[in-house]
Amino acid sequence: MHRLLLASAITLALSACSSKADEVPAGSQTAAPATLDGVELIPREALFGNPERANVQLSPDGKYLSWVAPLDGTLNVWVAPAGDLSAARAVTRDTARGIRSYFWSYRPDTLLYLRDSGGDEDFHLYAVDLTSDQSRDLTPFEKTTAQVVGVSDRHPGTVLVGMNDRDPQWHDLYRVDLASGERSLVERNTHQIGEYVADADYVLRYATRSRPDGGLDLLRRVGEGWEQYDEIPFEDGMTTGFAGLTKDGGTLYMRDSRGRNTNALFAIDTATGEKTLVHEDPRVDVGGALADPVTGKVQAVAANYLREQWAVVDDAIAADLARLEAIGPGEASINTRTLDDKTWIVAYSAAESPVQYYRYDRDGNGGGELSRMFSGRPALEGKPLVPMWPQELRSRDGKTLVSYLTLPAHADGNGDGKADQPVPMVLLVHGGPWARDAYGYSSYDQWLANRGYAVLSVNFRGSTGFGKDFTNAGDGEWAGKMHDDLIDAVQWAVAEGVTTEDKVAIMGGSYGGYATLVGLTFTPDTFACGVDIVGPANLNTLLSTVPPYWASFYKQLVRRMGDPETEEGKAWLSERSPLTRVDAIKKPLLIGQGANDPRVKQDESDQIVNAMTAKNIPVTYVLFPDEGHGFARPENNKAFNAVAEGFLAQCLGGRAQPIGEEFKGSSITVPTGAEGVPGLAEALQSHTQEVRR
């Protein structure tokens, strides 16, 4: 099921890897300078350029170490013998957007990766044979997005893949041969199934089907058909779902919020239906889980309130996790475990610390060898990165808003997380909105803080992870109470001396871009300026143009937002659309958009830009012809952020690195408003556009 409507464009723009820890660059603690001029300017290239290495993994047999790294400036997959990193070689040859998402199959010397074209999110699945370095498209069909359903060590030569080439709304299920690329039909999806669960033998066991009321039917396999055995009410649709199946098929894991507020992880006996609680946290929903690679049994469960904490439920790895926890005060994540579970790849990071990759060879009692391999972004080692401070704010109606504050180095001399003096602030709003902000390294937080701004990220109502009541409190509240929470957070920051009322900008991607537009139209006196990245301006056209394969989620979506197919719904969505209040805009606005965005179409940005232009309201519009829902190519990401940096400096008074050569290799265009950002028009005159899909 598609849990996120509008994944954060900021996150997409940063993603060069598959785990958050992979994105964490380096930092060091030094004496705080008295003024911003005393803080070293961190180059945008170090923050937003390609990582040196990311998404580090071991093959299941432990034979190879792999990672993502640049090849001629474009991210590709590299492989080395596990014991000889100097023998690394690139095994993919992408020259456009780069490879970010990859994983190992159980077929010897074969890995898999996903790639779309120009940000259209029609992801194809490719197999790479390391003996020949040849890539094969396993899903070679137009307008098709692949969904990987199963990869099993019991059937190493094949994978289960959903493909929507027959019907763009629904994925049929195929078994695909990794050597030949041939596919054989497992199930033609005539039941409008949104999610399949198969066991280790690729036998279909469970599925979900959307209900007209926005809830879900839970189905189980009976013979060659399906029967409904339970349901998920609409209210639990965001917080309840399947969470895995043990390899013997005897235990089904579910995250379940039915009959409670926060969801918990349960183990269900597939033969008897007996349900056993594995882990719960009264403050938050359960998060990720670690499972034994041999059995599939859950061994540890995460919960993230202010920071992520792991609860061990299998003593077999208790000593190992304690060993990793002792690396430092940051957070350790396990990227991969070999099939025999003897070797782990670990990424350690903190908000202001580098990602450090470790190899951990287990001895069974936590005393194995833990060896550091390398840093993901060594260019940031020794740079003045700053901490992130978790906060618990109060909304006007008494809700707790878990938030995160980042202060510029010169504004927090004693490092206590409290501002010594007010500084300009950027309210950085996450996407989704069914997502959350969390502790950890953020290149945007570090960039903005280094330029002299405090950064506040708020988990407003509607965010996920804090129980279904908090998530459901956002229903029908786009541009309503969800926005009130953001305003309350700004008022908190002013009252705490973090900033002043006249020096607050709002910025965000996707839903965060929408929140930016709402900020400048619904509350036009609150913010000094706004930066909108792929944010929708017209909720009616947004919901009328979602990708066809969102069909399994659409009923829930419109119930939470409004139905564009009813007159009442249209009126409601129009009322909550920034486009209807363009006349109210009186502060500077910068908009960034990808021309191929399948979620928030280019027309969303075009509509508000055209409306503003017709009313002679200034706006700067940056458009990338080879991007989608966010800016994946580092050249484009750096180009947009160079523009945003100059825009914010003019608005808030922070410092800005000149645009310089930052447009090199990018596809940037500025259809209107280049004169609104210092140096932008001049930089465009000398720029030669490079479009890569």
Language-model features, listed with the residues they occupy:
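C-terminal motif of bacterial Sec signal peptides marking the signal peptidase cleavage site
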Residues: 14-16
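Multi-bladed beta-propeller domains
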Residues: 19-53, 80-100, 129-146, 176-194, ...
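Beta-strand-rich domains and repeat architectures in extracellular enzymes and scaffolds
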Residues: 41-78, 344-345
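A flexible loop/linker signature enriched in serine peptidases of the S9 family
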Residues: 50, 68-76, 94-99, 106, ...
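Non-catalytic accessory segments flanking enzyme active sites
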Residues: 54-57, 89, 100, 123, ...
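Hydrophobic beta-strand positions that form the internal "hydrophobic ladder"
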Residues: 62-65, 111-112, 159, 205, ...
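Cap/lid segment of the alpha/beta-hydrolase catalytic domain
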Residues: 376-502, 509-510, 515, 537, ...
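Active-site-proximal cap/loop segments of hydrolase catalytic domains
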Residues: 460-693
